[in-house]
């Protein structure tokens, strides 16, 4: 059984990293339903924090589908930006500016370059859509940051 079987997936891509449509393409055939997908400019938002509209969307979709059924996939270009977004959907908005301030959703959250995502999707499609970005992103730093956030704040340890 895949990590994505029957899950409602929220995709937050990055203009300078991995865009939403690339991750959507990878998820086809995984049993996941993409319920929201956007491509943001992570460095454009205040201090790299998650866009307030996206925070509201994540909160609303989590209320609708229940936290155990929701998975967030990020495409941030930098480990720090990925970490801030991951912290926002697990422990609440660390900048205390948005709708998720103080809201601990504890959602499953992964970056598109992490093995949990990469191993769950079609390898050929992944290579076409994301493979090139692996060469320019600091994959090890992103994996470490995401893992740390999940271990510290994630409610679901599967």
Swiss-Prot record:
What EC number(s) has UniProt assigned to this enzyme? 1.21.4.2, 1.21.4.3, 1.21.4.4
Which top EC class is given?
A: oxidoreductase
The UniProt entry annotates the active site at 44
Pfam families, alphabetized: GRDA
Q: Kindly give the InterPro entries that the UniProt entry links to this protein.
A: GRDA
Recorded GO molecular functions are: betaine reductase activity; glycine reductase activity; sarcosine reductase activity
Tell me the superkingdom of the source: Bacteria
What does it catalyze?
acetyl phosphate + [thioredoxin]-disulfide + NH4(+) + H2O = [thioredoxin]-dithiol + glycine + phosphate + H(+); acetyl phosphate + methylamine + [thioredoxin]-disulfide + H2O = sarcosine + [thioredoxin]-dithiol + phosphate + H(+); acetyl phosphate + trimethylamine + [thioredoxin]-disulfide + H2O = glycine betaine + [thioredoxin]-dithiol + phosphate + H(+)
Provide a GO CC annotation, any one.
glycine reductase complex
Record's signal peptide: none
Q: Which UniProt keywords apply?
A: Oxidoreductase, Selenocysteine
* Family statement: Belongs to the GrdA family.
Subunit info?
Answer: Monomer. Component of the glycine, sarcosine and betaine reductase complexes, together with components B and C.
Free-text function comment from the UniProt entry? In the first step of glycine, betaine and sarcosine reductases, the substrate is bound to component PB via a Schiff base intermediate. Then the PB-activated substrate is nucleophilically attacked by the selenol anion of component PA to transform it to a carboxymethylated selenoether and the respective amine. By action of component PC, acetyl phosphate is formed, leaving component PA in its oxidized state. Finally component PA becomes reduced by the thioredoxin system to start a new catalytic cycle of reductive deamination.
Write down the NCBIfam families for this protein, in alphabetical order: reduct_selen_A
The identity of this protein, by name, is Glycine/sarcosine/betaine reductase complex component A
